[in-house]
């Protein structure tokens, strides 16, 4: 293992231990996934030395990679299992999709929809160099409408703040499935766990405040005027 890799590995171990001690990581499965995925491979080159600081980082086009504690919270709530098919709305750098892929592989997979083509390319490259492209498919499009060709999904993860839960995503969620989504305004939201019962009833639970970039799309916020 190269010296840089050892340094990053130790930093990743310290971060995961801290997230466990603070209660953000509650399961061994999520701890192992976050230990395995090299976050420094999913941030811009000039920010690699900050990859294991618990804060969001800019990835271009006004978008960010979420803080590790928020990735842990959302992944614990989502509870992806081996064999699950997961839809992610907002690929960003591809990091969160890689963490989820660790939890659903070898037979599960992640479909992630990104509206910004340059970020979709960034995510694809990051996933390819880390080997997660075998389990993650990156698409360009309006994620608020989901991706009907692969529906229904066991789990849906939304990584941007929505004004409400998009109806298309509810329709594409399997009975018995779970969705994690930030709901609120363009700046501050609450993190919701949305569950669809086996008979199709929708249940929502709130899990505290958060701050995500706005979810832009037909069933989200409109693109701000320039």
Curated annotation (Swiss-Prot):
Is Cytoplasm tagged as a keyword?
yes
Q: Which NCBIfam families match?
A: pimt (TIGR00080), PRK00312.1 (NF001453), PRK13942.1 (NF010549)
* Role: Catalyzes the methyl esterification of L-isoaspartyl residues in peptides and proteins that result from spontaneous decomposition of normal L-aspartyl and L-asparaginyl residues. It plays a role in the repair and/or degradation of damaged proteins.
Q: What is any one of the record's Gene Ontology cellular component terms?
A: cytoplasm
GO MF term list = protein-L-isoaspartate (D-aspartate) O-methyltransferase activity
Which transformation does this protein catalyse, written as a reaction?
A: [protein]-L-isoaspartate + S-adenosyl-L-methionine = [protein]-L-isoaspartate alpha-methyl ester + S-adenosyl-L-homocysteine
According to UniProt, the name of this protein is Protein-L-isoaspartate O-methyltransferase
């Amino acid at each position: 293992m190269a010296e840089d890799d050892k340094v990053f590995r130790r930093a990743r171990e310290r971060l995961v231990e801290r997230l466990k001690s603070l209660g953000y990581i509650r399961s061994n499965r999520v701890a192992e996934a976050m230990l395995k995925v090299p976050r420094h491979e999913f941030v811009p080159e000039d920010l690699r030395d900050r990859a294991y600081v618990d804060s969001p980082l800019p990835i271009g086009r006004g978008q960010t990679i979420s803080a590790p504690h928020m990735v842990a919270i959302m992944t614990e709530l989502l509870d992806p299992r081996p064999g699950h098919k997961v839809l992610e709305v907002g690929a960003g750098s591809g990091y969160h999709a890689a963490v989820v892929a660790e939890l659903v592989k070898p037979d599960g997979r992640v479909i992630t929809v990104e509206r910004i083509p340059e970020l979709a390319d960034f995510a694809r490259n990051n996933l390819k160099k880390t080997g997660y492209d075998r389990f993650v498919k990156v698409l360009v499009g309006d994620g608020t409408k989901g991706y009907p060709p692969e529906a229904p999904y066991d789990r849906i993860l939304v990584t941007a703040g929505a004004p409400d839960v998009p109806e298309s995503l509810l329709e594409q969620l399997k009975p018995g499935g779970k969705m994690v989504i930030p709901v609120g305004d363009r700046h501050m939201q609450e993190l919701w766990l949305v569950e669809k019962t086996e008979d199709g009833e929708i249940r929502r639970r709130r899990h505290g405040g958060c701050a995500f970039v706005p979810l832009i799309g037909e069933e989200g916020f409109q693109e701000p005027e320039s």
